[in-house]
């Protein structure tokens, strides 16, 4: 006859009851899950931290028929970001490269690619400019310049017949004719003549351009552009020297005159002469 261990039976029954209770509690916990899955989640407690607002994006609707630009538009997430530390672009100084000629009493802006040369040997004018073609091989030596083009500037004084013309248009044409004979003393035919109005810095003027087709076919076509700016001297003797200046730009078909640059050069001329003081009249007699 087998003897029953009451303690063992009691323990087994206790574990069975606990197992059934665990299973029952698990069933009681897990069964409502499918129903709770479709329910709204419980609201989270409010946070004390303030979230950073998301950057607003501007939505731009193009007009019908408007061309589509390939550049990045405002609000484009692919647009490059601006560097707050980037330097602001510097404004271009219109007087950069300005040169003052004390002998002629004027200043001008040096054209790009040109250098000032020795002018003491000039028969007319007080400034000689040469076109640079390469830098000097040795530091300190003069720049290598072209030999078939040059620019001469100076005061339109009585050395030049053109100074007798009070009208700047006529003075520029006369100057071009005289300088053409002086610098291009070869037989030929003048072609492609032009008159170019000038006005800048309150100084009116005119330019005359033409080309010379030489009789010698081996010579390249010559080109000359002469400009006159300023006002002719008054008839009174105390007004000082002439307030007119000239520019002569010489070139060839191999190294042509830049008419746009010639216009800018002439229009950059400014008077650097001291104003003539007004004469002081004697006081009227009292009586």
From Swiss-Prot:
Compartment(s) where it occurs, according to its Swiss-Prot or TrEMBL record:
Secreted
Say which family it is in: Belongs to the Apa family.
**Which keywords annotate this record?**
Repeat, Secreted, Signal
Q: Which gene encodes it?
A: apa
Q: Which residues form the signal peptide?
A: 1-39
**Entry-linked InterPro entries:** FAP (IPR010801)
Q: Where is the composition biased (Low complexity)?
A: 40-56
UniProt region (Disordered), positions on chain: 40-88
Which spans of this chain does UniProt mark as sequence repeats?
Answer: 76-79, 83-86, 93-96
Organism encoding this protein: Mycobacterium leprae (strain TN)
A GO term for molecular function: extracellular matrix binding
- Descriptive protein name: Alanine and proline-rich secreted protein Apa
Pfam families, A to Z: FAP
Give GO cellular component annotations, separated by semicolons.
extracellular region
| Region 3 X 4 AA repeats of D-P-N-A, residue ranges | 76-96
